[in-house]
């Protein structure tokens, strides 16, 4: 994660024209004739762009990861200017003379007197009613990807000093005081899933204090804590757009956040319009410092912990079960196709015994592999298995929903059972657990092992899901070319003799020996 300037201190120039006498009236009249519709006798602040076009305000025009950001004025913006009496006056009219150059805007004030060498200017957000209070919204909405059009209404703010120039005009340069986060979600490796799901909202949760609310702005700096409506949560509603396969600017999302050091968790809500199934993906962002006037970029690998359960193989085969015949793969119970693997085909099962050697998925020392018998015993004994009749999972490129079990992720099992893992030599692949926490190496011989686990009915909440993953027991398996769906599904282990089977009608899971016949089962690396 990197930070960068939103807008430098040399961000915006504005000219103040005090309308006194005929000459000033002529100036206003000329502006009106140009279609700017400024009221007569108004004090006009003309926001002028400097040589570099990105030094403007207030809607995001463009942002590239790791670089400065260009923003523009909107016709709905207004500023507050402190008059000769020390009272902040609100601009009543905002005009952008040239739609092609929104870096230049006119602000008309009809109240107050402005004759000093300097006048304080503040911007407290779109539709603000106070020059001394800013509200960073807990509910923010982005209607288009890579658009910060909600910048002003979500809590942006800034200060400046307008200085009188020899020609009688006043100019100021705005300094931003809110902080900003840019999120780049992506879905890698699963092209079908990427095309089928949409991002509906992002929720940022702080465990270290408020990140939104109403803040005192009387000193020109946001107060350290909210004075009202404090919130540890910011919800950004997104436009339900596609999620990119890479970190890209055109599919990014923005939020205003209170400056400071925050420990954050992000929840990404995705939905599949075809199946009407939704799922939340939770990521801990850690502790980050958000600086006034700067963006913090955050990348998010949405599907990193989403397992796709239709990676079918015969045991230790080099190619997937339906490789080359994906278009005719049967998915309905009882249907079949004759193009299933035959002897001599790379899709056919390996004839060796023990652990796999042909396919990394079946090789225990590979970075991503189906569970070994030893690893499976840790899931059974210490995985806190929980039943769920409506868990969301990924199958055939879509989000689906059905019965299955939640397990603790292996990293959580290790953390919760550090002493037991140490007693097993620190390697759960090398030594498993038996009932009564007795150590047992299930890969040492070929006797049949009946590992049982009975899931509880404990509800797995959204917050729990950061430490758990869902295994569906309702997806098909293949015997030859026939699609079978029974009370429970089966999954491969690295050892040819065993598979992991689930019977959902009595909530038991067990392993059993390899039956006769060519089987196509999911080869799933568990988390």
Annotate each predicted stretch with a short phrase.
Residues 22, 81, 87-95, 101-109, ...:
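Short beta-strand element of the conserved SAM-dependent methyltransferase core
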Residues 347-349, 354-356, 362-388, 392-394, ...:
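Long, compositionally biased low-complexity segments
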Residues 403-527:
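C-terminal, surface-exposed recognition/capping segments
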């Amino acid at each position: 994660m990197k930070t960068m300037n939103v807008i430098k201190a040399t961000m915006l120039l504005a000219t103040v024209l005090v309308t006194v006498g005929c000459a000033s009236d002529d100036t206003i009249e000329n502006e009106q004739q140009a279609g700017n519709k400024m009221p007569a006798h108004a004090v006009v602040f003309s926001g002028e762009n400097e040589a570099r076009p990105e030094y403007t305000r207030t809607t995001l025009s463009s942002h590239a990861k790791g670089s400065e950001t260009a923003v523009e004025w909107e016709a709905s913006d207004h500023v507050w200017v402190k008059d000769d009496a020390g009272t902040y006056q609100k601009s009543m009219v905002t005009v952008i003379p040239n739609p092609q150059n929104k870096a230049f805007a006119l602000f008309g004030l009809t109240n107050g007197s402005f004759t000093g060498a300097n006048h304080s200017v503040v911007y407290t957000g779109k539709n603000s009613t106070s020059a001394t209070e800013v509200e960073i919204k807990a509910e923010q909405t982005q209607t288009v990807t890579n658009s910060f059009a909600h910048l002003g209404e979500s809590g942006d703010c800034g200060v400046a000093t307008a200085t009188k120039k020899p020609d009688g005009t006043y100019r100021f340069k705005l300094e931003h005081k809110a902080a900003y986060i840019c999120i780049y979600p992506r879905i890698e490796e699963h092209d079908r899933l990427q095309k089928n799901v949409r991002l509906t909202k992002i929720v940022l949760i702080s465990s270290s204090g408020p990140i939104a609310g109403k803040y005192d702005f009387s000193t020109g700096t946001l107060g350290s804590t909210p004075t009202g409506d404090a919130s540890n949560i910011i919800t950004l509603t997104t436009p339900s757009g596609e999620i990119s396969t890479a970190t890209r600017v055109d599919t990014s999302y923005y939020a205003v956040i209170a400056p400071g050091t925050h420990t954050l968790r992000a929840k990404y809500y995705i939905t599949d319009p075809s199946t009407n199934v939704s799922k939340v993906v939770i990521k801990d962002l850690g502790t980050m410092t958000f600086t006034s006037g700067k963006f913090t970029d955050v990348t998010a690998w949405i599907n990193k912990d989403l397992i796709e359960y239709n990676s079918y193989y015969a045991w230790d085969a080099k190619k997937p079960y339906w490789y080359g015949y994906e278009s005719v793969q049967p998915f309905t119970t009882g249907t079949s196709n004759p193009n299933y693997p035959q002897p001599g085909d790379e899709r056919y099962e390996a004839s060796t015994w023990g652990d796999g050697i042909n396919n990394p998925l079946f090789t225990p020392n590979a970075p991503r592999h189906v569970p070994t018998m030893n690893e499976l015993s840790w899931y059974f004994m210490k995985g806190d298995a929980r039943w769920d009749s409506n868990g969301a999972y990924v199958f055939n490129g879509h989000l689906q929903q059905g019965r299955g079990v939640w397990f603790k992720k292996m990293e959580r099992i290790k953390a919760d059972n550090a002493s037991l893992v140490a007693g097993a030599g620190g390697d759960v692949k090398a030594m498993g657990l038996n009932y009564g926490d007795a150590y047992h190496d299930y890969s040492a011989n070929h006797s049949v092992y009946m590992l049982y686990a009975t899931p509880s009915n404990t509800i797995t909440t959204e917050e729990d899901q950061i430490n758990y993953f869902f295994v569906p027991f309702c997806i098909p398996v293949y015997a030859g070319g026939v699609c079978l769906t029974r009370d429970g599904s089966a999954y491969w282990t690295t050892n040819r003799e065993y598979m992991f089977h689930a019977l959902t009608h009595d909530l038991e899971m067990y392993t059993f020996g390899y039956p006769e016949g060519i089987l196509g089962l999911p080869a799933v690396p568990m988390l």
